[in-house]
A protein has these predicted regions:
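Mixed-charge (Asp/Glu-Lys/Arg
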Residues: 1-34, 40-148
């Protein structure tokens, strides 16, 4: 039986793939052992996508947030610290709020350890715009065009 955390993660990956397939040439779901969760092909360029999904609310100073941690669940062989993603592992993070069915795309940044977004701000999010902005920051790619 699959645990709930794994189900939330897989649901997020499939939701991200759904959004990406509307605008990009192809999307490949990788296997569990890969550093990236999805490979995205857009305008003849491949991007590695790491999906982070949450189903819970983080409360801080009376406000409600969704929060994502950018560290994989793996530790160094000596258990000294969690391994961090590198630029060779990830091009884009896809941050999924499962309760809203929305995705925020952000380009990889070496300084990011976690990110939180107020729920009310996430509700207003335009997923397509966030993907377009992330791709533009990474590589000045052409505009996204949905299928008809």
């Amino acid at each position: 039986m699959v645990d709930e955390k794994s189900r939330i993660g897989r649901a997020g990956e499939h939701l991200v793939a759904f959004y990406l397939l509307q605008y990009c040439d192809s999307v490949i779901l990788t296997n569990e052992n890969s550093k990236a969760d999805l490979i995205l092909d857009h305008s003849d360029r491949l991007y590695k996508v790491q999906v982070k999904s949450t189903n819970s609310i983080w409360k801080h100073k009376g406000k409600e947030y969704y929060r994502w941690d950018f560290r994989p669940g793996r530790y160094r062989p000596d258990d000294s610290e969690k391994i961090r993603y590198t630029a060779s592992d990830v091009d884009i993070y896809a941050l999924v709020a499962i309760p809203l069915g929305k995705v925020l795309f952000v380009p990889y940044n070496t300084d990011m350890k976690s990110i939180s977004k107020r729920i009310e701000d996430f509700e207003k999010l335009d997923t397509r715009e966030s993907l377009e902005e992330a791709l533009n920051i990474i590589n000045h790619v052409p505009s996204l065009k949905p299928f008809k």
